[in-house]
């Protein structure tokens, strides 16, 4: 039965299915018979959160333990947030409808820097104090994980526990310590955190002090408790085959942004694109066996009823058994009317065989990431793709009947000039011209080439962490020049808002002094900052000014190669020396080959205790 207040709220909002729960695949347990209750919170709408594969992995993993119960919570949309505040209805989980304060731990996934005010909004709706220092052992532990944990410093003061790296071993270990402490009784919050701090990859922000230089740079980050490491090394799953993919998703009531079956075929990437934070955070690359993936995929589609299967990873076409896997999947998928999609295909290893094996049921859209408009700039960012490869790939696609292609680029890249911006338009025009030059193209059909252009944001743990981000004026000038450089109605241009990218850049490289800014901006009405209709840029800028913080200090200045950064105490495997070496190669427009062809000494092999690949085998 729903609480009367909840029933009233649901009757007054759009899409009440976002908040009702009861979806197929949901896990229900007797809360009186479980020892640990964990609330997995996604700081965005239900539709966005239900697209997140990481939540599905950890939800199934924790709920395999009979005496643990993992439930879900999402950020309510504007109308529901207002109703919950009006009715004094605390934020609750989808399964039990219990408030977040009833849980032992409340975990947030940090997927995007612009979601930080939504975290505060969810804590506020739950009646939970923002700052860790204001919560004793009677409050739930507030836990964070995900890619933005690689520099969680702007929000570190809000969290009791931050997980660096991969959570499959880490999160169950945290829950086990919570269970042990509850059974012992009388364990203080500090004692529990000291125990949790011993788990590989766990960062307890309260156990570190940060000092600053007179010019505002970080001076030092030092542990303040005995036995706490000076640097925290990320957690990693050495063998992905030891963790089978989830085979029974919660199927959403309201259509998710990506409403399909999804299975992670590999983790990490061998390519070494210098702009790509994920490529460095998840090193080294590890893949699952084709036989395991085929069985899991078949079970997943049977259990959920989905008719589209996505083979997910940073670079799916680099899986060493991809052709074998596709052959196995095509033994059963067409019979079950299940289509296959490979969302991360690369221009340089796209083939007729791949396109034939993934279009037996229906065609999905084709998106290729060229990233930069000229070969010089592609060399700078180590995007080892040439025009000849782009031409070959588009030829294969057009001959297979495709008439629409999306090309993904970035602007604001290091060393970029207006000639590189013109190169984006020229590349798109060459693709249009290529289509009309092919004799096999569909008669009477036109072509549509979409340019999708993101603003480059330098990120920690990459070779470009040292570079300043373009100013908003520079980015707007480049966007204008791109539009003026496109002369064909066959080409459509989309680009990102530079103001949200600026805020993303500030938090990506920010430090603990930003926490009060985030709190104050939230109090002034900033949340859902990633949504164009909700973003209050002027409010953010006024908040920075009122608190005496210059946001440009964080993202629009060069970082010294020997400078202590807010993330210097976080070890994701790749050494600082390697990042500097790659940065210098970028300035010289020199490329680095994929690391499955030759080891370049990035340092990530120490996470596995040996070589990342068997270089005696032909891995190319």
What is the predicted function of each stretch?
Residues 40-41, 299-406, 411-450, 454, ...:
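Conserved SAM/AdoMet-binding glycine-rich loop
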Residues 76-223, 463-511, 519-533:
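Glycine-rich beta-alpha loop elements in corrinoid/cobalamin-binding modules
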Residues 78-79, 154, 209-213, 320, ...:
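Flexible glycine/acidic-rich beta-alpha junction loops that bind and position SAM and/or redox cofactors
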Residues 38-44, 62, 250-277, 301, ...:
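N-terminal pre-triad scaffold of radical SAM enzymes
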Residues 67-79:
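A short beta-strand-loop structural module common to alpha/beta enzyme folds
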Residues 1-27, 38-40, 487-620:
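Radical SAM enzyme core and accessory elements
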Residues 7-39, 46-47, 205, 211, ...:
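N-terminal [4Fe-4S]-dependent radical SAM core
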Residues 52, 255-291, 601-619:
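Canonical Radical SAM [4Fe-4S] cluster-binding loop centered on the CxxxCxxC motif
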């Amino acid at each position: 039965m729903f609480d009367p207040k909840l029933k009233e709220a649901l009757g007054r909002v759009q899409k009440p299915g976002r908040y009702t729960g009861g979806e197929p695949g949901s896990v229900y347990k007797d809360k009186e018979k479980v020892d640990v209750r964990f609330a997995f919170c996604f700081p965005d709408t239900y539709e966005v959160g239900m697209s997140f594969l990481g939540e599905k992995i950890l939800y199934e993993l924790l709920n395999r333990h009979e005496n643990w119960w993992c439930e879900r919570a999402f950020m309510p949309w504007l109308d529901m947030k207002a109703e919950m505040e009006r009715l004094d209805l605390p934020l609750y989980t989808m399964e039990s409808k219990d408030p977040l304060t009833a849980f032992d731990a409340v975990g947030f996934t940090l997927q995007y820097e612009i979601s930080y005010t939504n975290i505060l909004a969810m804590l506020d709706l739950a009646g939970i104090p923002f700052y860790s220092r204001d919560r004793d052992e009677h409050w739930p532990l507030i836990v964070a994980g995900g890619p933005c944990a690689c520099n969680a410093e702007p929000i570190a003061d809000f969290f009791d526990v931050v997980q660096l790296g991969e959570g499959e071993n880490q999160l169950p270990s945290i829950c086990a310590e919570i269970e042990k402490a509850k059974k012992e009784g009388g364990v203080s919050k500090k004692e529990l955190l000291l125990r949790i701090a011993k788990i590989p990859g766990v960062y307890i922000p309260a156990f570190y002090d940060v000092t600053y230089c007179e010019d505002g740079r970080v001076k030092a980050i030092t542990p303040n408790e005995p036995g706490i490491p000076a640097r925290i090394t990320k957690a990693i799953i050495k063998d992905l085959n030891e963790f089978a993919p989830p085979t029974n998703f919660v199927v959403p009531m309201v259509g998710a942004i990506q409403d399909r079956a999804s299975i992670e075929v590999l983790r990490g990437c061998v390519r070494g694109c210098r702009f790509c934070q994920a490529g460095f955070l998840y090193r080294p690359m590890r893949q699952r066996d084709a036989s395991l993936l085929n069985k899991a995929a078949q079970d997943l589609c049977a259990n959920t009823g989905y008719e589209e299967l996505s083979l997910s990873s940073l670079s799916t076409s680099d899986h060493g058994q991809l052709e074998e896997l596709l052959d196995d999947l095509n033994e059963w998928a067409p019979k079950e009317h299940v289509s296959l999609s490979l969302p991360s295909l690369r221009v340089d290893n796209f083939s007729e065989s791949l396109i034939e094996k993934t279009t037996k049921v229906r065609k999905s859209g084709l998106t290729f990431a060229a990233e930069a408009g000229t070969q010089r700039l592609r060399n700078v960012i180590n995007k080892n793709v040439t025009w000849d490869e782009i031409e070959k790939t588009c030829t294969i696609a057009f001959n297979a009947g495709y008439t629409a292609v999306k090309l993904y680029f970035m602007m604001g890249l290091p060393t970029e000039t207006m000639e590189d911006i013109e190169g984006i338009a020229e590349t798109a025009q060459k693709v249009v011209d290529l289509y009309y030059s092919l004799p096999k193209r569909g008669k009477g059909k036109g072509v549509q080439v979409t340019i999708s252009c993101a603003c480059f944001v330098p990120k920690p743990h990459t070779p470009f962490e040292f570079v300043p981000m373009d100013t908003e004026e520079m980015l707007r000038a480049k966007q204008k020049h791109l539009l003026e450089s496109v002369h064909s109605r066959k080409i459509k241009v989309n680009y990102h808002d530079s103001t949200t990218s600026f805020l993303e850049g500030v938090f990506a490289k920010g430090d603990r002094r930003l926490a009060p800014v985030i709190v104050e901006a939230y109090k002034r009405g900033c949340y859902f900052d990633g949504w164009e209709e909700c973003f209050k840029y002027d409010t953010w800028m006024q908040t920075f000014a009122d608190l005496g913080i210059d946001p440009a200090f964080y993202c629009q200045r060069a970082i010294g190669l020997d400078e202590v950064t807010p993330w210097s105490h976080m070890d994701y495997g790749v050494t600082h020396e390697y990042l500097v070496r790659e940065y210098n190669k970028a300035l010289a427009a020199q490329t680095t080959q994929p690391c499955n062809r030759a080891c370049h000494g990035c340092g990530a092999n120490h996470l596995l205790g040996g070589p990342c690949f068997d270089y005696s085998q032909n891995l190319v």
